[in-house]
Amino acid sequence: MRRSDYLLVFLGALLLALSRLPLNLGWLVFIGWIPFLMVFERCNCRPRQLLWVAAIKAVVYILVVMYWIGAVTPPGLIGIVLVYTGFYFIAFYAIYRIYALLPKLRYMGFVAVLISFEYVQNFGETRFPWFNQAYSLADYTILIQLADLGGVVLLSLLCLLFNVLIYRLLAHKRRLQPLVIIILLLGLWLGYGHYCLRYKPLEKHEAQIHVMQPSIEQDLKWDEEQYYRSMALFQELTLKAVEDSARLVIWPEGAVTRYLRHDLQAQLDLKAILDTVKVDIFTGFPHFEPAPPGHRNQELYYNAATLVRPGPVFGELYFKNILVPMGERTLWLDTFPFLWVLNFQQANWEFGTKLEYFQSGNLEFSPSICYELAFPEIHHRMAIPWDGLQHRYRKCDYLVNITNDAWFGTSYGPWLHAMMAKFRAVENRIQIYRSANTGISLVVDPKGRILAQTRLFEVTNITAPLYTSPEITLQRRIHRWPMLVLAFALLITLLSCVKTMPRRS
């Protein structure tokens, strides 16, 4: 590899990173991989050089898009750079071998390997699907309508396909085939988006659901004296929502900082608020239960949430199913119990094991907590669960996401996290109400349009009419289709591995 190749890699990584930020540069995702295609086309990389390519991609992308991790845990930022350098090296090495040994499949292999790289990040305790290219399209609501057919994986696949087509057009200027395909694909893509936005029917309901954003600073949130100030603020904001005819008020993740189901004073404090406001409240709080015999700890701790009605009447508890790797739980504790001795100031919550569905008024919703918003599959099961008794899908009226993004500070993190709600809404054609402690709180309709949104650290409530759609999306029915892409990527990678690499001249 020449020095210019490393510069191309740096340029491509920078373009892809900038496409993710709220700078109206999402279109860069359609050309950001072209420098990488130019490098792979030369097919003269050694493994050590590919490791440098992977390191440049990981360092540039993570420092531009995810620099805010370093403000919370500098070792965590270093760790994620090292881990994804390894992941990118595996992906790039597979692509390199496909280019060198299966050249007729090189473009298909390029797309399939990178799609597989994104898709596998949805599984296992290390799951961290923040590298999905589809999220670069967050500003283009018309383009994300296609997510109801194939999810974010289909959107990412199209982004990569456009990179390949534009590269071929630039490399072979006299060939019109890539240009024709680009025009045809873009026309179909925009046409479907226009049809969905204009013609897909929605039913409007005056549900009077309000989302609270109290904006309590992370450094103060868990202070004992702050607890009383927080509860007073919650009552004040909830009363304002009631004055606006609220029937349900959604508080953020961990709003009640005490163990609500075990703390009598916290229950009395919440009862006093409920007696005053006389509306349903959905809130997050920490929770613990006795550990089973033989467990290392005496209690199991959960990141929990529930619906509370005047009385108070507590609903079933929802326990967060997907935890932030290392932030909320050390990896592989069940497999390697000796890891319990490690202390990185993480919480070590337990995994929730089931979803919950709540009824407020005559409307049904299912909740997710914080990081879970990044995962399409769990939201498919929340929004459109399978009814095993009647052997058919049924659909909730809306979804709720609560989060505490205070630790993001004023970085791009809250925006990146919040925009995922647009994709989850379109994938399932369902409205999402999102309460974030310090922002960004929002209401997104089933077409991915933001109906209401807060500013960072704004103290306020927001609301919007509820729009529902009876549609059971194709994506819900076939959401495992990326497994086919993964299988194809594995197959051609294995084929390239059994062939002998040609000698270098």
Language model features with spans:
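Membrane-embedded alpha-helical bundles of multi-pass enzymes
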Residues: 1-197, 402, 409-411, 451, ...
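Soluble catalytic domains of enzymes that build or remodel membrane lipids, polysaccharides, and related
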Residues: 197-481
